[in-house]
Swiss-Prot record:
ATP binds at residues 118-125. This is ATP-dependent Clp protease ATP-binding subunit ClpX. GO terms for cellular component: HslUV protease complex. It comes from Histophilus somni (strain 129Pt) (Haemophilus somnus). ATP-dependent specificity component of the Clp protease. It directs the protease to specific substrates. Can perform chaperone functions in the absence of ClpP. Zn(2+) binds at residues 9, 12, 31, 34.
Length: 414
């Protein structure tokens, strides 16, 4: 006699008599206990998805101005006033972007930044360090290479193309980015009065940059192609991009001195006589800059209005240049010491050598920018021979290496 086959749950294997209900399907059965278990699992899955969505929507914490300033201190020596101005402006810019996601009756204005300071004072480094800290795309352009659309040269919209390239053409990321335009003082118009003739590399470029800096929806060809009528364009909202413009503005100090009467010039008994020590520093003068001064220099009023935050940088003295060589996280001397350590060789710079290098950079009037070429020249022959020299333990750069072009001192393993 064959035993009648008992019905059982296809999932847990329990027989019909062990459960309250057994529901039949086309090719199997499921019990009430398994149904309840599946229900709980689905409910938990919904909760997990909601948590995931909330987690994804939560933005990373925006660093405070104090935190931004502290990070800049790690990489840039001096320029305390400029760092403070930048920290506040950058914090307010990204706070503004986040506030746009919430409905607000008050529209917050865009605060682009103008950096004014001598060559090699750290303008580019400040902008690069900010972008790296905030983990946002960064693009840099030289204003002297830009021209209006239709002229030979680099179209101003190419700057946006570079920004998109640096974030793999992710438009949302690009719109959180920073664009630094260097040598902005080189595109000033030749006189205060508007010219009848076209000024291709001056006022015309300012006009072309105006819309981008102010905020517009620019059409950019994908993957760096050329524009043509049938092409589908990428649309980038530049009102969300932070623009930082920088320049040396040589001669602007004279314009400010003339307006504020701080130059100490004059003849006769009523003249304002000053000794050199009392002369107002370049940084203090630039802190007093007004839109009218920039107009006299050659920037158009509309362009000045789009750069409301002005951060002046000071000239670097000998002490600052020595610190730049040794103190920042990526200081030049540290970089070359790492290079030499890859060959298991120690590299040392004497204090006198560091001072001599700083003096040489000051004499060349290249600021911090000229330090790398000085160090590279000093170590060129040594680096050329380095892989071929056996038992070399240490290389010492002394003052004579800098001032008299003597070879660095080599020490060998005994």
């Amino acid at each position: 006699m064959t035993k009648e086959k008992e019905l059982h749950c296809s999932f847990c294997g329990k027989e019909q008599k062990e459960v309250d209900k057994l529901i039949a399907g086309t090719s199997g059965y499921i019990c009430n206990e398994c149904i309840e278990l599946c229900h709980d699992m689905l409910a938990n899955a919904d909760d997990i998805e909601e948590i995931d969505e909330e987690f994804q929507e939560e933005e990373p914490k925006l660093p405070t101005p104090h935190e931004i300033r502290a990070h800049l201190d790690d990489y840039v020596i001096g320029q305390d006033y400029a760092k403070k101005v930048l920290a506040v402006a950058v914090y307010n810019h990204y706070k503004r972007l986040r506030s746009e996601k919430n409905t607000s009756e008050v529209e917050l204005g865009k605060s682009n930044i103008l950096l004014i300071g001598p060559t090699g004072s750290g303008k580019t480094l400040l902008a690069q360090t900010l972008a790296r800290m905030l983990n946002v795309p960064f693009a840099m352009a030289d204003a002297t290479t830009l021209t209006e659309a239709g002229y030979v040269g680099e179209d101003v919209e190419n700057v946006l193309q570079k920004l998109l390239q640096n974030c793999d053409y992710d438009i949302e990321k690009a719109q959180q980015g920073i664009i630094y335009i260097d040598e902005i003082d080189k595109i000033t118009r030749k006189s205060e009065n508007p010219s009848i003739t076209r000024d291709v590399s001056g006022e015309g470029v300012q006009q072309a940059l105006l819309k981008l800096v102010e905020g517009t929806v620019a059409s950019i060809p994908p993957q760096g192609g050329r524009k043509h009528p049938q092409q589908e364009m990428l649309r980038v909202d530049t009102s969300k991009i932070l623009f930082i413009c920088g320049g040396a503005f040589a001669g602007l100090d004279k314009i400010i001195e003339k307006r504020t009467n701080t130059g100490g010039k004059g003849i006769g008994f009523g003249a304002d006589v000053r000794i050199d020590e009392e002369k107002v520093s370049l940084t203090e003068l630039f802190k007093q800059v007004e839109p009218d001064d920039l107009m006299k220099f050659g920037l158009i009023p509309e362009f000045i209005g789009r750069l409301p935050v002005i951060a002046p940088l000071s000239e670097l003295d000998e002490e600052a240049l020595v610190k730049i060589l040794t103190e920042p996280k990526n200081a030049l001397t540290k970089q070359y010491q790492v290079l030499f350590s890859l060959e298991n060789i120690e590299l040392e710079f004497t204090q006198e050598a560091l001072i001599a290098m700083a003096k040489k950079a000051l004499a060349r009037k290249t600021g911090a920018r000229g330090l790398r070429s000085i160090v590279e020249t000093l170590l060129l022959d040594t680096m050329y021979d380095l892989p071929s020299i056996e038992n070399l333990q240490k290389v010492i750069v002394e003052e004579e290496t800098v001032t008299e072009n003597k070879a660095p001192v080599l020490k060998f393993n005994s």
